Amino acid sequence: MSELSVKFFSEALKRNVRFEMYLPDAGNHEGNRKMKTLFLLHGYTGDADNWAGEELAQKYHFAVVAPNGENGFWLDGPATGHKFCTYVGVELVNYLRRTFGLAMNADETYVMGFSMGGFGALHTAFAFPECFGKVAAMSSALIIHEIAHMKPGESNGVANYDYYHGCFGDLETVETSESNPEVLVKRLKDNGRQIPEIFMSCGTEDFLLENNRAFHQYLEETDISHIYLESKGEHNMDFWKEYSAKFAKMMFGEERKKVGTRSIPRHG
């Protein structure tokens, strides 16, 4: 296993940035084809070190790339000028192609995230479907409808108006904006474009459970194929470690198959 910590100057973020990359010792088991690549997006208050990327890379023989998104919700923040979505979906993809020969096409490039990173994975995949062919999102912070119409001085117990305004822009119009994954995926469907294969999960004891159920229902009502799974679990690394392995197996391993809508029975 090769572990690399790579530093380069990001035009999207206007500073030097660092990402972690893991390459399996065995390399690519599919002959001369380029190695498949998985992007891992961390959650709120986290960083690239939150992931056990080396375990996934070694077991399934793909490259793992873990960037740092700070607390920016992996969005192009209109108020801050920090373009985290552009950084991942354009700049980092192109850097990996030029420098390492990775992430060459959507069929072999996937993105996965948990919590804030789950939101970011869905949003990034829908914003750049030509780059990402599959997306896995765990315990996703799908909070658009909660923060819509928040007023200055208000807080939801996690963060305040100023923070959300910095990440999402105008909260009066956020539900119909480019920051909303629902808007992006619906546009792909309406325009007849390829939608990335979608894998989602959430724990039945997770405080974001209803948010994830609502997005699952939206995808069903919009007739967008996806897999949605629930099982006992909280908003923590135990659940994310279990499902990162499960989804990697489904996306890369012996359980690979055509995605169709599927959900397990709800509990409680």
Model-derived segments and spans:
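Non-catalytic cap/lid and distal C-terminal segments of serine-dependent acyl enzymes
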Residues: 1-268
